[in-house]
Amino acid sequence: MITFTKPLSKLIGHFEKFPGIGPRTAQRLALFILKQPESSIRDFSKALLEAHSNVGHCKKCFNLTSEEECEICRNTERNQKIICVVAETKDLLALERSREFKGTYHVIGGLISPMDSISPELLEIRSLVERVSKSDIDEIILALTPSVEGDTTSLYIGKLLTPFTKVTRIAYGLPMGSELEYVDEVTLARALEGRTNLI
């Protein structure tokens, strides 16, 4: 078995913590980093620190942004009366790639999962209810992963928001447990077009 020096092993270990990165890819990334000139490594380190320090959450929808409100919420050409609810920013990005949705978003930060000790209180659901109750919203579209956790979260949010506005859920042409970020743009566009009433 190949053993690496302690600094290299530590670097590989950090890369292995990244989502979707296995031991081999972590090794390739670490070896690639070591081949780069010191100036590139300094620029990379600076970019990491700047992103970590300056990127936060939009005060309105909780998308990632370096401003008080994200670009989507500030865009006056977007339909402010339709909100698409997603679990994570990566899901928002997937839906934006479909070019089908012209409204705004609300990123709740995960899914309800008692097994993982994630309760509704730990998600941005209360802020969503406040946002809807204080605004003239025509429709809430739930675009959550087709899974037990996604279904649980959709039903929970649906019960809270139905008294205020119409609540729909995107249609799915994908198997249970699929992640939205890996679904192609055409399937996502059709899912948005074929959305159905939740309750």
UniProtKB/Swiss-Prot annotation:
The keyword DNA damage applies. InterPro entries: DNA_Rcmb_RecR, Rcmb_RecR, Rcmb_RecR_Znf, TOPRIM_dom, TOPRIM_RecR. One of its GO terms (biological process) is DNA repair. Residues 81-175 form the Toprim domain. Signal peptide: none annotated. SMART domains: TOPRIM (SM00493). May play a role in DNA repair. It seems to be involved in an RecBC-independent recombinational process of DNA repair. It may act with RecF and RecO. Belongs to the RecR family. This is Recombination protein RecR. The lineage of its organism: Bacteria, Bacillati, Cyanobacteriota, Cyanophyceae, Synechococcales. The gene is recR.
